[in-house]
């Protein structure tokens, strides 16, 4: 199956997943690719485009693409079905709940990933627990709780909070939805990366010309690896130059 064919699976899942916003139902739609004409002229380049993820499901971040596909894929796997064949209505049906019971998804986050997991669990009528490291913003905690999750800020750093989350999951039979992999834990992070590819597919279809350079944030590496993998599969040896960047400090 081609890269675009594989990625249509992720978009099919998103298209079938409607969510409540402002009292109505709004379906998935691609976020805009904005052309920054003036900045391109200032820099002396022909075109400059930026993917504006502030519109993504009203959550102001792309992270929900990964969490939603990972949780959907987990449920499909538990049912022994292909996610291609699972509509949103079936995912939230009484039949599925009777087969699987109520699942609890747990994660460590400093903000957007946890909010995406909480949002998805809420829409799929499941439970979410989110732990945030010491120093996390109170506003982000509030945003996660607003999505129906049990969430709190710990007195530990990120790595220790992650270990605490893992211990709780093992003790209680909860499902970890983390965007980083470690020995023995690779399937869910891979699903998350596959979900991120939705954004790459959108950009590929929106671009009027083949890009020459792509700039991506480093983060934990999931987005960078996902988008690079997508364009490498599309363009092969003529893949655009990719730069992985992070803000100073």
Positions of PLM-derived features:
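PLP-dependent amino-acid enzyme catalytic core
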Residues: 1-249
């Amino acid at each position: 199956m081609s890269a675009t064919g594989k990625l249509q699976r992720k978009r099919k899942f998103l298209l079938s997943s409607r969510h409540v916003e402002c009292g109505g139902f709004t379906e998935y739609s691609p976020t805009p690719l904005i052309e920054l004409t003036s900045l391109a002229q200032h820099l002396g380049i022909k075109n400059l485009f930026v993917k504006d993820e502030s519109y993504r499901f009203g959550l102001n971040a792309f992270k929900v693409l990964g969490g939603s596909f990972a949780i959907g894929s987990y449920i499909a796997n538990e049912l022994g079905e292909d996610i291609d064949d699972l509509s949103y209505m079936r995912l939230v049906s009484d039949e599925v709940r009777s087969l699987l019971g109520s699942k609890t998804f747990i994660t460590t986050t400093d903000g957007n990933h946890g909010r995406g997991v909480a949002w998805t669990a809420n829409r799929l009528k499941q439970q979410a627990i989110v732990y945030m490291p010491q120093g996390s913003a109170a506003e982000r905690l509030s945003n996660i709780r607003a999505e129906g999750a049990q969430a709190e800020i710990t007195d530990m750093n990120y790595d220790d909070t992650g270990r605490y989350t893992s211990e709780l999951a093992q003790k209680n039979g909860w499902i970890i939805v983390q965007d980083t992999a470690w020995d023995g834990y690779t399937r869910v992070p891979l699903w998350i990366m596959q979900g991120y590819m939705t954004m790459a597919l959108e950009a590929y279809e929106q671009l009027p010309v083949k890009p020459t350079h792509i700039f991506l944030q480093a983060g934990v590496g999931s987005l960078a690896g996902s988008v690079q993998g997508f364009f490498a599969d599309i363009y092969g040896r003529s893949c655009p130059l990719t730069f992985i960047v992070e803000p100073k400090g």
